[in-house]
């Protein structure tokens, strides 16, 4: 989805999304400002937004498969019965895409961040359900090095450790030919809801090479930490060109999204 929204529209829409997802957890006192309108490159992703009666908001980011346009993916999702598929310039879709902090071509995913819990940095565990061809543990190494947030790996049978730690379930499978990867979550008050964040990696369209699968895993895991897309092909958060690692701009966004307490 192209970032063509004007700042005034973005600010109004961000307020609308926050109002629809009334806080059920701590209020986000460092919420991002409005959507970015000056990012390099085009974002062809498709966003889904579903405000819910319990005050949470379900959101998802789909990355179109090769040869599939964003409009074609939207049509496919709607035919499959997915509600809340956002058009390119729809208010709710613009309202969750590409917020500050913005560093270079990297941005945060508006209203999607982890609570600190009892720690100085949020603790996020990726629980791996994926097949052997997906190097989730290697991709996690990159995100563990990011400042501001600690990312850990666990095989799914070990379970979520609890105690204020957060978990993201990572799956792989044959999900059709319309998209590479999907990150979905529920939020409340600008924070991820524990137990709701899921990554899905598509065996059916992602080339079965280490580079391609590490890139897609890195991309979706970055969303699960609170990042939106990056306009530079030096980052795995870009439109898939199969770069395998985050960029320094991605790390800088996380460092600002999760400042040390008291700073």
Protein language model features and the residues they cover:
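Secretory targeting and sorting signals
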Residues: 1-30
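Zinc-dependent metalloendopeptidases
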Residues: 28-263
């Amino acid at each position: 989805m192209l970032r063509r929204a004007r700042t005034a529209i973005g600010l109004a829409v961000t307020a609308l999304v926050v109002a629809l997802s009334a806080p059920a957890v701590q209020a986000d006192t460092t919420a991002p400002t409005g959507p970015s309108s000056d990012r390099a490159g085009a974002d062809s992703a498709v966003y889904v937004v579903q405000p819910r009666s319990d005050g949470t908001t379900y959101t998802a980011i789909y990355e179109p498969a090769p040869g599939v346009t964003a409009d074609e993916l939207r049509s496919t999702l709607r035919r499959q019965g997915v509600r809340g598929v956002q058009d390119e310039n729809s208010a709710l879709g613009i309202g969750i895409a590409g917020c500050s902090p913005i560093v270079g071509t990297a941005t945060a995913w508006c209203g999607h961040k982890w609570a600190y819990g009892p720690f100085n940095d949020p603790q996020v565990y990726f629980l791996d359900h994926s097949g052997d061809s997906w190097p989730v543990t290697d991709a996690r190494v990159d995100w563990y090095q990011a400042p501001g947030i600690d990312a850990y790996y666990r095989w799914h049978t070990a379970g979520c450790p609890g105690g204020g730690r957060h978990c993201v379930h990572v799956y792989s499978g044959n999900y059709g030919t319309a998209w590479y990867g999907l990150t979905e979550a529920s939020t409340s008050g600008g924070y991820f809801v524990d137990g709701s964040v899921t990554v899905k990696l598509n065996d059916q369209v992602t080339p079965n090479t280490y580079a391609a699968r590490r890139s897609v895993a890195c991309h979706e895991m970055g969303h699960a930490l609170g990042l939106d897309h990056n306009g530079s092909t030096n980052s795995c958060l870009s439109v898939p060109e199969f770069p395998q690692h985050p960029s320094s701009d991605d790390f800088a966004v996380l460092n600002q999204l999760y400042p040390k307490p008291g700073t």
